[in-house]
């Protein structure tokens, strides 16, 4: 399970008791490995989730959100990896969400990490820039323990290298996986029609299926690219695609050069779209932009642009401590708010993360159970005509 540290699955930091309860229930319901990351690589935002996974005997895999910039040196990565191991992580994932890790850089990084920590190293990348298979090859030769792949119908583009290709690449070598290619072919054949359906329906956009070398210039992750394409379509501004791509690294620099991974990728991307469509930079800022520049998401590797920060948040106080230290426990309050809908413990967490969607779902679930028509029900007063 991919887990956004203190942000869990959402876009804001939650109280420690909510994080701990979510980890506990995830493991109780069958999750075994929790990949925990933070969009700032701020380890303060990871410690609660890691300790909770340790307590419940789950596998805590902590991700390094890989990115480029003069602050992101080998010394930076090895230092943070050592601290992650000391924190109690069971393994480390190099999370290359934008496909920026080049083959020979992968050799350097994996070699340095293997010399620094004893826990296993997993490499996760995307094919957006077209180099992912070569990056995996060099990483495996350098000693990486795990690589993440996707079955061929859903591979390449903003996804991962194809499983079948990597299996065949290493066949007959010391890295042979032993996987049966015939069985993999059966799996691929099963999913191929679904790919075609997704393309025909528009659920998958052909724009994100190919190689985009501009990724290496603008450092845009696959998920962020998909989101940006969708935002521009909604605004009938698809012609602004290249302008937004050029704006993204400028916004990222203003924001202290964070790695572009959820939620920072969406915050930077949405702000870049606003800057381009409004015709003036930071004329309009999202609430998430204001929160980021206020330190609510944690510490960035570089300082914010002071002029941009002043324009966006004015004299708002900037957080310098661990953001979650300012959030009182909220689990009891959340349970009290939704107690009329609670049928199982997990409902509390659904409501905590997605209150509006959860409430709509709870109403629908109850209607199905009681065989009532929600269009006739007075849900506010819990009344129904007879």
Model regions and ranges:
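Catalytic cores of alpha/beta
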Residues: 72-84, 129-145
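Conserved, mostly hydrophobic/aromatic
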Residues: 36, 84, 92, 143, ...
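Terminal or standalone catalytic/regulatory effector modules within metabolic enzymes
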Residues: 205-215, 219-386
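Alpha-helix-loop-beta-strand connector modules within alpha/beta enzyme cores
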Residues: 1-2, 49-65, 106-123, 167-179
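Core active-site phosphate/anionic-ligand binding loop and the adjoining beta-turn-alpha structural block
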Residues: 134, 159, 167-170, 177-234
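Glycine-rich phosphate-binding active-site loops on the catalytic face of alpha/beta enzymes
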Residues: 36, 96, 142-159
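Active-site beta->alpha loop and helix N-cap motifs at the rims of alpha/beta catalytic domains
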Residues: 1-85, 102
């Amino acid at each position: 399970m991919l887990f956004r540290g203190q942000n869990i699955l959402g876009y804001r930091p939650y109280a420690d008791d909510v994080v701990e309860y979510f980890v506990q229930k995830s493991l109780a319901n069958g999750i075994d490995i929790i990949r925990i990351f933070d969009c700032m690589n701020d380890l303060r935002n990871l410690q609660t989730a890691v300790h909770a996974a340790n307590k419940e005997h789950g596998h805590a895999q902590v991700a390094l959100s890989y990115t480029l910039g003069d602050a992101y040196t080998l010394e930076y990565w090895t230092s943070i990896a050592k601290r992650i191991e000391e924190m109690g992580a069971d393994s480390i994932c190099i999370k290359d969400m934008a496909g920026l890790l080049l083959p020979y850089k992968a050799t350097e990084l994996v070699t340095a990490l293997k010399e620094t920590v004893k826990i296993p190293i997993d490499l996760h990348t995307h094919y957006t820039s077209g180099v992912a298979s070569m990056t995996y090859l060099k990483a495996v030769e350098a000693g990486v323990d795990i690589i993440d792949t996707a079955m061929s119908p859903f591979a390449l583009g903003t996804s991962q290298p194809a499983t079948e290709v990597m299996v065949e690449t290493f066949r007959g070598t010391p890295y042979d996986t032993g996987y049966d290619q015939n069985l993999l072919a059966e799996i691929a054949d099963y999913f191929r029609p679904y790919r075609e359906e997704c393309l025909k329906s528009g659920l998958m956009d052909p724009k994100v299926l190919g190689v985009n070398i501009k990724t290496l210039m603008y450092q845009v992750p696959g998920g962020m690219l998909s989101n940006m394409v969708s935002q521009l379509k909604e605004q009938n501004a698809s012609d602004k695609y290249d302008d937004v791509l050029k704006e993204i690294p400028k916004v990222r620099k203003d924001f202290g050069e964070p790695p572009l991974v959820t939620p920072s990728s969406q915050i930077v991307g949405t702000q870049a779209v606003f800057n381009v469509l409004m015709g003036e930079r930071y004329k309009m800022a999202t609430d998430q932009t204001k929160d980021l520049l206020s330190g609510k998401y944690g510490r960035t590797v570089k300082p914010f642009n002071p002029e941009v920060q002043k324009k966006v948040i004015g004299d708002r106080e900037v957080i310098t401590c661990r953001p979650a230290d300012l959030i009182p426990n909220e689990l009891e309050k959340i349970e009290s708010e939704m107690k009329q809908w609670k049928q199982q413990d997990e409902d509390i967490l659904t409501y905590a993360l997605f209150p509006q969607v959860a409430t709509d779902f709870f109403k629908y679930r109850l209607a199905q159970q009681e065989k009532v028509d929600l269009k006739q029900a007075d849900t506010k007063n819990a009344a129904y005509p007879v």
